[in-house]
Amino acid sequence: MGGGTPIITPMHQCLAANVISEVEGIVNGTTNFMLTKMVRENLGFDEALKIAQELGYAETKDPGDDVDGRDACRKIAILSSLVCGHQIYPQNIPTRGIRDITVADVAAAERLNCVIKLIAWCKSLSIHCVMSLLSR
């Protein structure tokens, strides 16, 4: 999950002695790769997607699970279910992927000394998977 980051077992181990009140992070390596390429190489979405597909990071036939945020949504649903102690369903999580990000969006973020990332988060039963503007 999240680029192979082991998180589920440590969460299980921590839950026995601690209360986790918030989970937040970049849980989809493909979109993170693409957004980084867009910033560093001034690429458009389609160009970044093509590179991700050529490298085998994104599906060639239907990259929608990654770029539309469905993969990240499913991952935060799993993590949120662990934290909350009951099933959280992906269809109940507001989700927006990166498909509509443009070179102009990336440039606007840069002017603010920020970057755009797909962040999945759960805090006090408020769960989202959306693009976020993060300061550098």
Where do the model's predicted regions map?
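Substrate-binding/catalytic subdomain of NAD(P)-dependent oxidoreductase enzymes
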Residues: 37, 47-136
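Rossmann-like NAD(P)H-binding beta-loop-alpha module
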Residues: 1-57, 63-71
